[in-house]
């Protein structure tokens, strides 16, 4: 069969311009990647991953960070050196601590000499350490923290840990810096395994995977350009999501195109003719779905959080680069390789596709027999699962933001146990210098404040370091921060605790603005594409229900099963945007086919069941690939990525196998022509027309 396919390729090889076009496309892509490659490699250099980098410019804690740059020495890096021994520190332990902290002071320019703060039970001593030498240079900050950790050592029962905001930021930088390689390799491996299983070919799976890699490189270069040209915020989270989207969405588009191309090869003598027919057949649906996804993602530009606002265009770039590569480079490579790339299941010109029993025909039949019962049961199930969202763990604390326990988190735990009546994480107040004395006095009399120290002055501002009585990131500390903001008119209150408060406030505000915007934009696009009001409303309602159910499953599993002790404030918004955009993406493929069947004269029930039978396999394969790529995030060392990956992966699976297969199909059967109201298809039956090639085949 392989020899016959090669002979056929020789007889049907395109000539003239058609023969040169694929080579020209490949050459153009090679040139683009050669130019874009250096910029792609620099994307990690422009990432920012501190909490303050995520906040809106108007936030009080953001103003504190900006003003600190104006103070002598610029922004400070604050650490807490923790010495602890169960049963109490010995004289030798205290001498070791004094010697090591003196070594830190001798090796670095500190704001003040380290001063011991013993715990009441005698088990712990902490030494606050602060320096302005690294400034805003993340590498210099991390190097400072690493050097301090090399200097202070425990042993023999003496525990030594380095905590504080500076250590937490350094540990976060290391985690984000280590994401790129493992994330990419794991994603590639997962997609490769799925493509091998879907295509059952030792060669074909390599082509879309390689093209997705090219698209990933291009997207990184484009995002680097957006950062340089338009100051788009790039974070480790947004970079990770972009990679997932390029491989997930790109592979989905490849599945649709390759499926149709395989089918057209049995009808066309030449590969380039088959590819042209395949692009005409599935291209409009792919373009429409990707445009809808990109439009939904770009709604994040309305977010107040700079991290979410940057996520929108970055994710949209990933989708559009994947689309561009899969509709240009992938067709060119497939045409050049000819039919033999499908070996051993080579499609032969003039052959008839094998008739196979369709699982989706059986599933559609069950939905079609009792559509109302299926629709109600599915709706009740999604609603019941959504109730689990009320069980989501509380807001994510810094100490719980890692899936492991780095040194900085261990230090915070030790401090919380040893100093129950004192915060180990100062609140930073910046007061106008001419009113600094009054601000200092007011701060000392504010309820919940344990102590206040005056710090640096410069640029018309004076820094006050406030220690709260309550532990960091507790309700008591938040009450103290609110009281300081109310009492100190004209001053700014910041620090890690205030940053977390501002992050949660901005996230809540963004949820109320971006969610309606996404729903409206997606609904309008669907109305234009489907020429109906009912079908778009049904699709949007379905994906919203999926989002609620996915969050509910997360609420049931995050803490009891996965051990996650907090919910990232941005989780509801980001998962909503992705699930609505990606869910509607699959809905477009299915409803586009239902509409085509109805326009050919099929009755509403026949149109719905035929659409499911002919597109179900590809949509299921695409859903599995996309869910698997997002599931890769659950293996990452950051709680925010684990939660996002889990919710989106579960949501995609629910959408693929419950909503698209049963609920949308049963709704189409139950509503009959009313599904297309007020369009023409809702009023007048269409006379049967000769059947055209299917829009989407099976994998």
Where are these regions (language model features)?
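Membrane-embedded transmembrane helical bundles of large multi-pass transporters/channels
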Residues: 1-42, 136-392, 498-699
């Amino acid at each position: 069969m392989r020899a016959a396919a090669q002979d056929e390729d020789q007889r049907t090889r395109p000539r003239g311009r058609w023969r040169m076009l694929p080579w020209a496309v490949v050459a153009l892509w090679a040139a683009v990647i050669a130019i874009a490659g250096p910029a792609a490699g620099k994307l990690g250099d422009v990432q920012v991953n501190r909490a303050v980098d995520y906040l809106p410019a108007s936030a009080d804690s953001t103003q504190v960070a900006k003003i600190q740059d104006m103070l002598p020495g610029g922004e400070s890096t604050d650490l807490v050196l923790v010495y602890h021994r169960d049963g109490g520190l010995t004289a030798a332990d205290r001498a070791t601590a004094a010697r090591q902290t003196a070594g830190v002071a001798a090796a670095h320019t500190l704001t003040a000499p380290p001063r011991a703060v013993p715990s009441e039970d005698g088990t712990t001593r902490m030494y606050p350490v602060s320096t302005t030498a690294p400034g805003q240079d993340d590498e210099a900050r991390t190097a400072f923290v690493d050097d301090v950790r090399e200097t202070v050592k425990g042993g023999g029962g003496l525990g030594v840990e380095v905590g504080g905001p500076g250590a937490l930021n350094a540990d976060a930088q290391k985690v984000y810096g280590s994401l790129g390689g493992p994330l990419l390799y794991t994603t590639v491996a997962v997609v490769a395994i799925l493509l091998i299983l879907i295509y059952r070919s030792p060669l074909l799976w390599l082509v879309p995977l390689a093209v997705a890699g090219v698209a990933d490189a291009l997207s990184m270069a484009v995002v680097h350009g957006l950062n340089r040209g338009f100051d788009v915020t790039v974070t480790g989270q947004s970079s990770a999501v972009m990679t997932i989207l390029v491989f997930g969405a790109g592979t989905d588009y490849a599945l649709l195109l390759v499926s149709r191309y395989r089918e057209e090869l049995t009808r066309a003598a030449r590969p380039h003719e088959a590819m042209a027919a395949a692009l005409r057949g599935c291209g409009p649906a792919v373009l429409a779905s990707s445009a809808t996804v990109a439009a939904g993602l770009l709604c994040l530009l309305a977010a107040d959080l700079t991290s979410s606002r940057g996520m929108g265009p970055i994710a949209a770039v990933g989708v559009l680069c994947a689309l561009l590569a899969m509709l240009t480079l992938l067709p060119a490579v497939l045409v050049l390789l000819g039919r033999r790339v499908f070996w051993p299941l080579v499609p032969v010109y003039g052959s008839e596709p094998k008739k196979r029993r369709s699982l989706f025909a059986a599933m559609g039949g069950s939905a079609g027999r009792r559509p109302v019962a299926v629709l109600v049961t599915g709706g009740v199930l999604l609603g019941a699962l959504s109730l689990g969202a009320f069980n989501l763990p509380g807001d994510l604390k810094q100490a719980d933001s890692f899936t492991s326990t780095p040194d900085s988190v261990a230090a915070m735990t030790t401090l919380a146990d040893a100093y129950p009546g004192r915060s180990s994480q100062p609140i930073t107040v910046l007061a106008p210098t001419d009113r600094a004395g009054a601000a200092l006095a007011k701060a000392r009399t504010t309820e919940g404040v344990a102590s206040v120290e005056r710090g640096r002055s410069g640029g018309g501002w004076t820094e006050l370091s406030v220690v709260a009585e309550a532990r960091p990131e507790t309700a008591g500390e938040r009450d103290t921060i609110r009281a300081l903001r109310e009492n100190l008119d004209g001053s700014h209150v910041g620090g890690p605790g205030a940053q977390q408060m501002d992050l949660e406030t901005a996230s809540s505000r963004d949820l109320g603005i971006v969610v309606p915007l996404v729903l409206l934009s997606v609904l309008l696009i669907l109305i234009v594409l489907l020429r109906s009001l009912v079908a778009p409303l049904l699709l949007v309602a379905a994906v919203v229900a999926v989002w609620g159910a996915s969050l509910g499953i997360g609420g049931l599993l995050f803490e009891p099963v996965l051990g996650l002790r907090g919910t990232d404030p941005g989780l509801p918004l980001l998962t909503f945007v992705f699930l609505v955009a990606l869910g509607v993406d699959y809905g477009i493929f299915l409803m586009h086919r239902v509409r085509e069947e109805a326009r050919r004269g099929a009755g509403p029930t026949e149109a719905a069941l035929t659409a499911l039978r002919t597109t179900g396999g590809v949509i299921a394969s695409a859903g599995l690939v996309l869910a698997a790529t997002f599931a890769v995030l659950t293996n990452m060392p950051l709680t925010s990525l684990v939660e996002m990956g889990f919710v989106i992966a579960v949501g995609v699976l629910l959408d693929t196998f419950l909503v698209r297969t049963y609920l949308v199909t049963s709704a189409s059967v139950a509503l009959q022509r009313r599904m297309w109201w007020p369009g023409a298809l809702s009023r007048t039956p269409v006379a049967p027309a000769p059947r055209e090639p299917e829009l989407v085949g099976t994998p």
